UniProtKB/Swiss-Prot annotation:
The lineage of its organism: Bacteria, Pseudomonadati, Pseudomonadota, Gammaproteobacteria, Alteromonadales. Pathway: One-carbon metabolism; tetrahydrofolate interconversion. Homodimer. GO terms for molecular function: methenyltetrahydrofolate cyclohydrolase activity; methylenetetrahydrofolate dehydrogenase (NADP+) activity. The keyword Amino-acid biosynthesis applies. One of its GO terms (biological process) is tetrahydrofolate interconversion. NADP(+) binds at G166, A167, S168, I232. It comes from the Bacteria. This is Bifunctional protein FolD. It comes from Shewanella frigidimarina (strain NCIMB 400). Pfam families: THF_DHG_CYH (PF00763), THF_DHG_CYH_C (PF02882). GO terms for cellular component: cytosol. The gene is folD.
Length: 284
């Protein structure tokens, strides 16, 4: 068996095209374009690349993007004050604060300062709680994008054994909630998990998000499984690889996401979808 590649790049581009059409229709009907505030603190190279991609995507679909690039020395109080300004600005529908933040700033305090109806990253406890209660509104972008990828396979998720490897607030935990909502019997693995191999081998649907190259050996994959690899790791030779041993896994799985070009583009597409949703449902 050779797995079908789930082309996140193509699916994300299709979403962007649809969003661009919706923004054009809004403008033609006399409504404003959605507005997204993107806040970057410090000069972390990877964060600058991610923020650049998000700003470019906003421009492509016709959103109004406001950029705030702050020095590493910016205080927590200064950042919170900027968030308050964005919360009060009626032309801003979504607020994105690029993580990680410098060590002297409390991530949780910053996330909770963003109004839940402008939390287009889907990190606010209110929005995560809505997902846990099975009434999601603004959903965490990476898990939301992954669900779109899974739906693209045409596989019915109800009753599938799903395993999530990684329990971060950004991916693993909300991913578990998304899969429960989709009718899966879901196991979440973390650093204290015993017999990880067994739990991976039983998975009809496997999502891996640990940030370690080749962490899951390809021969652990259940034949016919769907494999979603969230990891993006740069090796010493400059190449990018995921958390799953791709070449071996691709011989056993039915569907698999590549790295790059799988989950990454979908995270940004979901951010754009959330921003339009916030604009239409809450602010316009």
């Amino acid at each position: 068996m050779t797995a079908q590649i789930i082309d996140g790049k193509a699916i994300a581009q299709s979403i962007r095209t649809t969003l661009k059409q919706k923004v054009t229709q809004r403008r033609q009907a006399g409504f404003r374009a959605p507005g997204l505030a993107v806040i970057l603190v410090g000069s972390d190279a990877a964060s600058q690349v991610y923020v650049g991609s998000k700003r470019k995507a906003c421009e492509e679909v016709g959103f109004e993007s406001q950029s705030f690039d702050l020095d590493t020395e910016t205080t927590e109080a200064e950042l919170l004050a900027l968030i308050d300004e964005c919360n009060a600005n009626p032309s801003i529908d979504g607020i994105l604060v690029q993580l990680p933040l410098p060590a002297h700033i409390d991530d949780s305090k910053v996330i909770e300062r963003i109004r839940p109806d402008k939390d287009v990253d889907g990190f606010h406890p209110y929005n995560v709680g809505r997902l846990a209660q099975r009434i999601p509104v603004l959903r965490s972008c990476t898990p939301m994008g992954i669900m779109t990828l899974i739906k693209s396979t045409g596989i019915d998720t109800y009753g599938l054994d799903a395993t999530v490897v990684g329990a971060s607030n950004i991916v693993g935990r909300p991913m578990t909630l998304e899969l429960l909502l989709a009718g899966c019997t879901t196991t979440t693995c973390h650093r204290f998990t015993k017999n990880l191999e067994q739990k991976v081998r039983q998975a009809d649907l496997l999502v891996v998000a640990v940030g370690k190259p080749g962490f899951i050996p390809g021969d652990w994959i259940k034949p016919g499984a769907i494999v979603i690899d969230v990891g993006i790791n740069r090796l010493e030779n400059g190449s990018l690889v995921g958390d799953v041993e791709f070449n071996v896994a691709a011989e056993k799985a039915a569907f698999i996401t590549p790295v790059p070009g799988g989950v990454g583009p979908m995270t940004i597409a979901s951010l754009l979808e959330n921003t339009l949703y916030a604009c239409e449902q809450y602010h316009s």
